[in-house]
Every structure is written in C-alpha cells, then in structure tokens.
Amino acid sequence: MRSLLAASTFLRSGASPLLRPLSRPLPSRLNLSRFGPVRPVSAAAAAADKSRGGGGSAMEAQPSYPGEIHVIVGPMFAGKTTALLRRVQVEAGTGSRNVALIKSDKDNRYGLDSVVTHDGTKMPCWALPELSSFQDKLGTEAYDKVDVIGIDEAQFFDDLHDFCCKAADRDGKIVVVAGLDGDYKRNKFGSVLDIIPLADSVTKLTARCELCGRRAFFTLRKTRETKTELIGGADVYMPVCRQHYLDGQIVIEATRIVLDLEKSKVIHAFK
C-alpha cells in the first residue's frame, strides 16, 4: 500500500529540514495534524549547505530522467487541497520518494506552517512569498533529495510557470499543483492556466452549489470588495452553479446600486 511522505526531519548534516517517508497509509479521511511543523533553515545554514556542493555546471545538474507536472483546478470548496495530498501520496509510491509541500504566505487563514483542508486536516509545509526562494530556503543538498513537490494555492505565485519548468524539466521533480483556475469574476486567476500546456495531467474538480446542490463550477463572492486577491473562506465565498452565479451577479449589482443611493442620501443630508 502506498505511503505518505509527510513528516519533517533533519538531514544528517543538520543543515536543512526535509519531509521524509512515513510507513502508515493515508486514510480515507485525512488526519495529518499529528505531524510537527517544518522549520525553515537559517540563511547561514543555507549558505553553508551551498558551500558543501551547491555549485556545478548545468550539465552536472541535469537529472537522468525528466520530471512531471500534474495540475488540479476548480472553484473554492471543491476539495483541491485534499486531492493534492492524495496525489502526493500516489506520487510518493511505496515510500522511496521524499516530498515537500509549499503554499503562498498570503494564505494565512489556518496559519503559515501547514497546508490545511477546509475540514481541518493538515500537513506541514513551507509558506513562501515566491517559489524561486524554495531551493535557497531548503538548501541545495536537501532540495536535491526532494522527489515530489506539492504546491497549494498556486494562483498566488507569479513565478509558477518558471518554477514548474525548472523543477520538472531541469531538476527532474514531480510537481503537483493545486489552485483556482478562475477568480470570482470568472477571469483567469494568476498563472495556473499558463502551466496547463506544460502538464502531464489536468484534473478539473467541482463543488456543490450552496444554493441548489447541483455541480458548482464557479466561486461567488458575497462581499462588495472588488480586488482580485481577497483571502477568505465561507464567510466571503461560496461555490455556485452557472444559474446561481448569474443570479448572484444580478443581486450583487442591485445591492450595490441600493447601497450607493443610500450613501448618497446620507452625504447630501449632511451638506
């Protein structure tokens, strides 16, 4: 039975933390809260790690086999994070591969030290502002030993395309990416769609419409905030079907007009 590589441990050098194999299988309901946090290495430790063998030509760094890229997309509450953890288990195989998880440090809903599903299950991760800093944070020696990289909330990483190309094509990593393909306006969100041409597989998940129970492909924002990046959960967003997405836009626009009129009346009353 396949096992999940999830626990944090230090390499023998003591320089860098790395997620190592576990012997227990992933249950049907994920329960990963027992794992301790992954702690980032210091800049000094990373520099020392580089000096031990981080250099080398591009030819020397070329892996003996190419990597892979697997993409998981869908609206909010579609189970993308759960699918990410399950896919990581599959790619981990029988326990012979090392895995590291990354998420954007913009996603602070459940803390920055774990990837957390909406039902509260978690797994330790690296929270980073950009993916390009991952190798430096982990250390070259530890990075070379990572076989599988999972990326959650991938829409927040501007350098997603470049990182995936480098990790899979040059470094031979298996990269599993989970993120929103569209924003609350149904427009492209971040660079997730840009890596689909690079992908070995693409999985489109759906949620259940919160209003009728039908399949939900879209995310409806319930507030008046208009900026694209607005971190939130069920208090801000809900998954909806096509009909209720369209109905919701009408309601939101009507509400905006009414509120603007009321605001205008209040302003004029004080003049």
Curated annotation (Swiss-Prot):
Binding residue positions for Zn(2+): C209, C212, C241
Catalytic reaction(s) noted: thymidine + ATP = dTMP + ADP + H(+)
E.C. code: 2.7.1.21
Positions with a binding annotation for ATP: G74, P75, M76, F77, A78, G79, K80, T81, D152, E153, A154, Q155
Gene Ontology molecular function: any one: thymidine kinase activity
Gene Ontology annotations of biological process type: DNA biosynthetic process; thymidine metabolic process
Top-level division of the source organism's lineage: Eukaryota
InterPro entries: P-loop_NTPase, Thymidine_kinase, Thymidine_kinase_CS
Active site: E153 (proton acceptor)
Chain residues that bind substrate: Y184, Y237
Record keywords, A-Z: ATP-binding, DNA synthesis, Kinase, Metal-binding, Nucleotide-binding, Transferase, Zinc
Similarity comment: family membership: Belongs to the thymidine kinase family.
Protein name: Thymidine kinase
Lineage, broadest ranks: Eukaryota, Viridiplantae, Streptophyta, Embryophyta, Tracheophyta
